[in-house]
Amino acid sequence: MARNKKQLPLLEKVTITDVAAEGKAIARVNDMVVFVPFVAPGDVIDIQLTRKKHSYAEGKAVFFHEYSPRRAEPFCEHFGVCGGCKWQHLPYEEQIRYKHKQVIDNLTRIGKIEMEEILPIKGSKHTTFYRNKLEFTFSNKKWLTEEEVKTGAKFDCMDAVGFHIPGMFDKVLDIHKCWLQNDISNRIRLAVKEYCLTHEGYPFFDLRNQEGFVRTLMIRTASTGDLMVVLVFFYEDVERREALLSYVAEQFPEITSLMYVINEKCNDTITDQDVLVFRGKDHIIEEMEGLQFKVGPKSFYQTNSEQAYELYKVAREFAGLTGNEMVYDLYTGTGTIANFVSRQAKKVIGIEYVPEAIEDAKVNSSLNKIENTLFYAGDMKDILTQDFINQHGRPDVIITDPPRAGMHDDVINTILFAEPERIVYVSCNPAAQARDLSLLSVKYAVKKVQPVDMFPHTHHVENVVLLEKLKVKN
């Protein structure tokens, strides 16, 4: 017999005091920290606990007694249900203030860093429609909101096109309007959905039972006006696939790259799948400071193009290049930073784990007639070794932009062996960055810190740190 779960208590008239990691807010009740999403400091609420541990608890707001004066009206109808844009209820100036504080807290608390200078965070000029890439999922298991459940109505159609509900791999929230990407994205998504619902033979995918035809939709935009659409199907049905793709091409002639994938795997990733061109090119072109970057369906490119430019300008400025330096660009991806700084460097060597990304990096150098870059593919800790440095020359500057987990200890040790004059550390996770900075502190001092907001209305923040080699005392 299953045991009944113990009902957790309701906490009444609790004041929210601060913002925490992962975008949640904090309340303190009897020396216990309570994490609550979708509330703002200054809100007075009733909290229904959903999880309780020894020193902390998690809960959700079930009633608002007072709304904080530091609260904004969310602009999206999906706020509070969708997993994105969780900070819409905070004014943007508050968002970037908390992100700035998050960077300081991580560097001082985790990294024990003494900072000479931390610059004001670079906010985003645009706080909506700033993404250049979105992926939507087709599902026959639509997530019903609390309001829909309360109506008691029966829904004949449970098909949805949108985003996965956090923690529910097979449930999808049906998105009416998303504020993250140019409105062409909304129009394409809704048109594809309507076509599939009104034409026979286009069942939405059932991820749990591995059934259905239409799986996912990717839309990529570029500042050049290029537009890529990729539709993913579970199996090949030439007649229906071509009918849908022809409809999309006819309705949206501005699409410059219309592609498709037949993905018969269990999961939705297409990194190991063939992406086939139905109409147009196999890529789009993005531009930055006169440079062109080829972006394919599998390419990594920063999803906020405007702020990516600001981020890379900071990295280049911190690098202090005069034209005589050997630069190593670690975790180079498609070589965006490497190519961006190449005109101010003598030579740039880029290293990246993904072979396809390195091929894109080489293409981007060729596209821009850049001849002073070299790119290598492989696991960073296996490529970047003392032998590699002895063979290719010691770098004057290392720029590193690792994944969220930060750098492997072997990579850090090799950097310490290389002893570049300057290290520019770009990070999407200031906590992991702080840990790495602590390890580098045996030979390097933090000189500048520049947070950059790439993702308005989320808790995520990018951070660029300049480290300089410590002078040896005689």
Where are these regions (language model features)?
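Terminal RNA-binding accessory module
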Residues: 1-78, 374
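Rossmann-like S-adenosyl-L-methionine
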Residues: 2-13, 18-23, 238-474
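Short, acidic/hydrophobic/Gly-rich beta-strand patch recurrent on exposed beta strands
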Residues: 25-30, 161-165, 232, 361
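Extended interfacial segments that mediate partner engagement and assembly in macromolecular machines
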Residues: 63-73, 80-203
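Internal alpha/beta scaffold segment
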Residues: 170-213, 235-259
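Short edge beta-strands and adjacent turn/loop segments
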Residues: 210-224
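Short, aliphatic-rich beta-strand segments
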Residues: 219, 225-234, 292-296
